[in-house]
């Protein structure tokens, strides 16, 4: 059975089960010649098929209509099989355990009233998680990305207000206090009934690709992942809504961090219209409620930039440190149990050792108060992540840092053993 592509109007062949079957007619075959854009494929929990340059994918719509539409008030939604399913919330609020203490509480969750209850097609709950994005079709955001693109390398150490030398120590002390207040729960995934660590990794990998496609700043990515983790620390989410939460998180982070954030319609587009603009805006509203509108949070990236300014290194070491730090975003366990300032210190140590065969300079030990012994546990976890990343299905970060502007640092091989004893 053939179907029509919603964006090109071309009849597409049936979709097969393997990676080679997920192809669509190229624009060259259609007689069109627009600039080629990166293709982000269909992702599943267990495997991500990486495609060679030039391959295109079929835009596959994997969610039923009832999954992604808000029902009218007072009406019930029928499942695809014509059976009335009991109403099910797309989100639930966790109640903190008494022993968690004030540190793990989620500000803003009390008193949240859900006026609209999501109706969920239960046939989808056990299916694979898919992310839909095909950049070969025409985007609603027809803006030349070079028009407003900033040189992030030029602004990182230049005009960034967190790097003002005169106030560096005071700013660092403030950020160290703030990172504790805005820390997600380290093991929140244990309380999630329908999503897994693997699904979160796929979502973060997809967010990295979205950031690269729209030339978003690195800090925007870190903020989006922070918003996502803090939201999931308080709310249980069904897998059919996980991408909606992630998209709302990067939309919110873009509005906060970017000078020229992509339009809301652009974020609807990157999900292949799986969610409506209304759904995305309402999810953004819910995200803000749960986060109590507290969006100014310290990230690993901010601390790393402070360290690099305090103790300068060569450009290769700097890029390698950024790459290693970004790898920590993929895994909630174990990296959420470490503070962002400590993860940044571990990333600095690992990159510095790989390039210069030194770990933690005395200058930074005095500035941060971290000794090498305190950094070692996180450093060991980051080292494992670096060794395993070539064999993982999530390759967006590695592909990003293969670029010449980062000096191909993701191709550098870390030593198998670190002399930490």
Swiss-Prot record:
Give the species this sequence originates from: Mus musculus
Q: Which GO terms describe its cellular component?
A: cyclin A1-CDK2 complex; cytoplasm; nucleus; spindle
Region labeled Disordered — which residues?
Answer: 1-21
UniProt entry tagged with the keyword Cell inner membrane: no
Top-level lineage group: Eukaryota
Q: What Pfam families has UniProt attached to this entry?
A: Cyclin_C, Cyclin_N, Cyclin_N2
Tissue expression profile of the protein: Testis and ovaries.
Provide the alphabetized UniProt keywords: Cell cycle, Cell division, Cyclin, Cytoplasm, Cytoskeleton, Developmental protein, Differentiation, Meiosis, Mitosis, Nucleus, Spermatogenesis, Ubl conjugation
User: How does the record describe its quaternary structure?
Assistant: Interacts with INCA1 and KLHDC9. Interacts with the CDK2 and CDC2 protein kinases to form a serine/threonine kinase holoenzyme complex. The cyclin subunit imparts substrate specificity to the complex. Found in a complex with CDK2, CABLES1 and CCNE1.
Chief site of localization: nucleus
User: Protein name, please?
Assistant: Cyclin-A1
The protein's PTM annotation reads: Polyubiquitinated via 'Lys-11'-linked ubiquitin by the anaphase-promoting complex (APC/C), leading to its degradation by the proteasome. Deubiquitinated and stabilized by USP37 enables entry into S phase. Ubiquitinated during the G1 phase by the SCF(FBXO31) complex, leading to its proteasomal degradation.
Q: Any phenotype upon disruption?
A: ales are sterile due to a block of spermatogenesis before the first meiotic division, whereas females are normal.
Q: What's the family?
A: Belongs to the cyclin family. Cyclin AB subfamily.
The record's Gene Ontology biological-process terms are: cell differentiation; cell division; meiotic cell cycle; spermatogenesis
According to its UniProt entry, what is the function of this protein? Answer: May be involved in the control of the cell cycle at the G1/S (start) and G2/M (mitosis) transitions. May primarily function in the control of the germline meiotic cell cycle and additionally in the control of mitotic cell cycle in some somatic cells.
Show the coiled coil region(s).
Answer: none
Q: Where in the cell is it found?
A: Nucleus; Cytoplasm, Cytoskeleton, Spindle
Gene encoding the protein: Ccna1
